[in-house]
UniProtKB/Swiss-Prot annotation:
Interacts with lipid droplet proteins. The keyword Ribonucleoprotein does not apply. It comes from Debaryomyces hansenii (strain ATCC 36239 / CBS 767 / BCRC 21394 / JCM 1990 / NBRC 0083 / IGC 2968). The gene is IML2. Residues 207-238, 287-335 are annotated as: Disordered. Residues 210-219, 304-313 have a biased composition (Polar residues). Belongs to the IML2 family. Pfam families: Iml2-TPR_39. Inclusion body (IB) resident protein that interacts strongly with lipid droplet (LD) proteins. Involved in LD-mediated IB clearing after protein folding stress, probably by enabling access to the IBs of an LD-stored soluble sterol derivative that acts as a chaperone in inclusion clearing. Residues 224-237, 287-297 have a biased composition (Low complexity). Keywords: Cytoplasm, Nucleus, Phosphoprotein. This is Inclusion body clearance protein IML2. Residues 322-335 have a biased composition (Acidic residues). GO terms for cellular component: cytosol; mitochondrial outer membrane; nucleus.
Length: 886
């Protein structure tokens, strides 16, 4: 039995709890309630797996069916996991598409889940329902409450239309989740030695029962319950025990199929598995029916199914030979209140393996997988050296561990990303994030957890490293630590445990490890284009734009594939459109942006502006003679008309501005707010209007200076994804509007494409992007010279050593000025570290000094300030990380 579970009052519980001498022994009358709750958790896990496989409606139907059954029982027992599961599903949909109506629905559901969770905490405490081997009653619903609160706050924080006040409200909500998660996380860390001791006892009991050919029913989900039949007793013949054992087996089979990645398969194909069997495939399994009803025609023994690879949450640090130290006189389990002391990392570091290429990659949904460096082994093969610890961990304990680790990891990373413009709010809120700690938590969860938390952790990592917004600045690399110089890669796709030392290695070169996990998840969920989208992003981050676009295009072109979740389709189409823009395939890019008007309500104004900008650039390519067309004049007219049509239509859909924006919502609950890119396009088009007034004889298109498509490409991280050919085309296209005979202009005394004299403001925009292009072409000296002479010198008035930094506050293009100084920091780093005798500490300090200047120039709330601030902060954090490594 469990001893001393409540010798001390738990710091985790929000309410006072009774203590019971002699440990936790659930009242038999509560067994059904406990198993009902565990079954609810497994049902919720399965419903959320349906979403991950793009079968959202199946998941919703499952939750609704279970909720109806729950209501019919007229039980007073709450079921808070159901609204949370639905809220998580709606949260994922909302953050994929950022559609106001979807965000509002998720907001309402998560608010309901918050309230339901607190009711469930009270209920479990009141009736002393001990669902965990370690934690006090109600702990799991403190986690569901924290998860609901966190996701709700993120919905508020992730809206680009937020100002300082809205962000502050979200941060205060985050603090509520932070406090709960911090308390439980500390408890988990304190309890790990006890957890491992109990795990060893469970494994020993399992082994003994297998050797004695006893019943194969796992009681791990019912703390305090003893299967007397396994000890020679006869209570298993009692009807109530028969029912309990059947329910325990049902929960076990649900957990097993989920961990193996087969829970969404045809249930008729499910096999009974003896959790106590050895790993040999020749062993047999006794079904629960024969165990509890052997003399009434129960099912015969069935061959043991090959056990699939498990993702164990914790690994027993004690070698199997040491299990004997737990002799028969010490058969009782411990609880967390028995042991409160600090402990080191208990993980055993794994040897490193050479990375394998994806030569024989799976072809899922007829779309070829191009991810390089991923392990191509079948995920359905069991690693015989890997212990099945996960099957000895209760569903509730698994949820607590993975849930806290995911949510606390997300919190740490999100707080670390707060841009400088609203970072001051953090001092009011009273806490700050630790990016490295948060990333380690996310990596550990993604590697070791086979549930919604593990997959969400992976999704967060993929968005963080390979997403369209630059959260981490890969341009800053320590010499010799570039991915190309790493000769050995840890194999993580089948790991049940990961050490801190291994996580530190992973954090240095994450691009070598995300492909392994993504390949595994695509195998679990082959129907969801979301994972294919992530693979495309990964390829784009590697500079393989053609492969990335081909992967996405082949998927949507295949008549046998279907994307059920419209948000995923919209995200895939948007990303593909940007890839085409990076490749200068402007017809395809414009086609995709226009298609988005019909399937997504995120921002019609931005889609129209993007499409018009693509047609404008195609028009300029024909003008420059960069592409051949059959009928030049006809093509020019077509692309010119299309560009003018969409560019002029874009502002009519801007909230609070255009005639077509009356039904446009601006965030949760409406508000008619403009997003940053709404303000951006209005400003750009105002410049065109001003130019037309100054030059009334010029056409609309001829009044454009630097083409806006290059600015849009920059903010979606396109310059870091182009190859040499694409970069050279970019350099030429940027020169279209340049002054005659100016640096890197396409205009000279013999030919002049620009119809008005380039002003200083437009020239600064052009030169900024040309300097970045030159740097990407490894022409560092040319690029930094261009940036200094034609951009920074125009607004920085004093930058001498030992003198205060001074600048002119310019407003023509608000994002430009801090961005130029940020890019100057990157030039400093690359120029300094390219030398053999580089002084890395000096390079770090000089680069950081430019970032500090960037913060000073960019101080304030302006259009795109959040994106600019994130880039600056990402670079600063990266450089701070280097300080600890040299």
């Amino acid at each position: 039995m469990f001893k001393g579970l409540r010798k001390k009052a738990s710091a985790l519980s929000l309410y006072s709890q009774p203590t019971r001498a002699g440990g936790m022994a659930n009242d038999p009358s509560s067994y059904d309630k406990i198993l009902k709750q565990v079954h609810d958790f497994e049902t919720a896990f399965k419903a959320m797996d349906y979403l991950l496989d793009d079968r959202t409606q199946d998941g919703i139907d499952l939750l609704q069916e279970q909720q109806k059954r729950h209501v019919k029982t007229e039980s007073q027992q709450p079921a808070a996991i159901f609204p949370l599961a639905l809220g998580v599903m709606e949260f994922i949909e909302a953050t994929l598409g950022f559609e106001p109506e979807v965000m509002e629905r998720a907001h309402q559901t998560l608010s309901e889940a918050e309230a339901a969770s607190m009711n469930n905490v009270k209920y479990n405490v009141r009736y002393s329902l001990g669902t965990s081997h370690i934690y006090p009653p109600g702990t799991e619903f403190q986690v569901t409450n924290a998860e609901s609160t966190l996701l709700n706050a993120l919905l508020m924080l992730l809206q680009e239309s937020n100002g300082v006040v809205e962000s502050a409200k979200a941060l205060f909500k985050l603090r509520k989740a932070y406090q709960t998660l911090d308390s439980i996380y500390k408890k988990i860390k304190e309890s790990e030695p006890v957890f491992n001791k109990n795990l060893a006892k469970l494994k020993k009991e399992a082994s003994l029962q297998h050797e004695g050919n006893s019943a194969n029913v796992s009681t791990v989900d019912l703390p305090g319950y003893s299967n007397q039949s396994s000890r020679g007793g006869s209570s298993a013949s009692l009807p109530q025990d028969v029912k309990l054992l059947k329910n325990l087996e049902t929960v076990y089979q649900m957990r097993k199929s989920r961990i193996e990645g087969t829970s969404l398969n045809d249930p008729s194909q499910a096999l009974n598995v003896n959790m106590y069997a050895a790993t040999s495939s020749g062993e047999s399994s006794v079904s629960v029916a024969s165990a509890v009803n052997s003399d009434s025609g129960g099912r015969p023994e069935s061959p043991r199914a090959t056990t699939l690879s498990q993702n164990a949450k914790f690994r027993n640090p004690i070698p199997s030979s040491a299990d004997d130290e737990f002799d028969d006189e010490d058969d009782e389990f411990s609880d967390a209140s028995d042991t409160f002391h600090s402990f080191g990392n208990l993980s055993i570091p794994h040897s490193m393996h050479k990375s394998s290429s994806l030569a024989n990659s799976q072809v899922l949904d007829n779309a070829e997988s191009f991810v390089s460096g991923a392990n191509s082994s079948s995920i359905s093969l069991r690693n015989s050296d890997q212990e099945d610890n996960h099957m000895h961990v209760s569903t509730v304990d698994e949820y607590i561990h993975s849930g806290v680790q995911l949510c606390f990891g997300i919190l740490q990373v999100v707080l670390s990303l707060i841009p400088p413009t609203i970072g001051k709010v953090l001092s009011i809120v009273g806490f700050r994030g630790d990016r490295e700690t948060g990333l380690k938590m996310l990596w550990r969860t993604a590697i070791t957890s086979r549930n919604i938390h593990g997959e969400l952790a992976l999704l967060c990592l993929l968005v963080f490293y390979d997403g369209p917004i630059q959260f981490i600045d890969d341009g800053y690399q320590l010499p010799g630590q570039e991915d190309a110089n790493v000769s050995e890669v840890i194999s993580i796709d089948k790991k049940s445990n990961i050490s801190d030392k291994e996580l530190e290695i992973i954090l240095k070169n994450p691009a070598l490890y995300t492909p392994q996990l993504l390949t595994k998840v695509r195998g679990y969920f082959p129907h969801n284009a979301l994972w294919l989208l992530q693979e495309g992003r990964m390829l784009a981050a590697q500079g393989q734009l053609v492969k990335a676009a081909t992967l996405m295009q082949s998927f949507t072109d295949n008549p046998e594939t279907k994307i059920n979740m419209q948000q995923v389709e919209a995200l895939l189409i948007f990303d593909r459109a940007m890839l085409y823009a990076f490749k200068h395939d402007y017809d395809e890019a414009a086609r995709d942006f226009i298609y988005l008007l019909d399937i997504n309500s995120w921002s019609k104004s931005i889609y129209l502006f993007f499409a018009g900008s693509c047609y404008l650039e195609k028009w300029r390519m024909i003008k420059l003679g960069m592409i051949e067309v059959e009928d030049r004049e006809k093509s020019l007219k077509y692309y010119g008309d299309q560009a003018e049509l969409y560019l002029k239509k874009a502002p009519t859909y801007v909230p609070g501005h255009g005639i077509n924006a009356s039904n446009k919502k601006g965030g949760i609950g409406g508000g008619n707010k403009q997003m940053p890119f709404d303000k951006f396009l209005l400003r750009k088009l105002q410049h065109i209007e001003n130019c037309q007034k100054k030059h009334p004889k010029l056409s609309f298109l001829n009044c454009f200076g630097t083409s806006p498509i290059h600015e849009l490409i920059y903010f979606w991280n396109g310059y870091n994804r182009m190859n040499e050919t694409e970069l050279k085309l970019t350099l030429t296209l940027l020169g279209y509007s340049g002054a005659v005979n100016s640096d890197y202009s396409a205009n000279n005394n013999e030919q002049n494409f620009a119809k008005f004299e380039e002003n200083e403001d437009e020239a600064m925009i052009r030169y900024l992007f040309q300097s970045i292009t030159l740097r990407s072409l490894n022409r560092l000296s040319e690029g930094v010279s261009l940036l200094d002479s034609h951009v920074i010198s125009k607004f920085v008035t004093q930058d001498s050593p030992n003198m205060p930094f001074k600048f002119i506050k310019m407003t023509y293009s608000p994002y430009l000025y801090p961005t130029a100084l940020y890019e100057r920091s990157m030039f400093v780093w690359l120029l300094r570290t390219s030398k053999k005798s580089a002084n890395l500490r000096e390079a770090i300090e000089e680069s950081k000094s430019w970032l500090k200047k960037s913060e000073m120039v960019g101080d304030g709330d302006y259009e795109l300030s959040n994106r600019t601030g994130m880039k600056i902060k990402a670079a600063g954090d990266r450089l701070d990380q280097f300080k600890t490594q040299i």
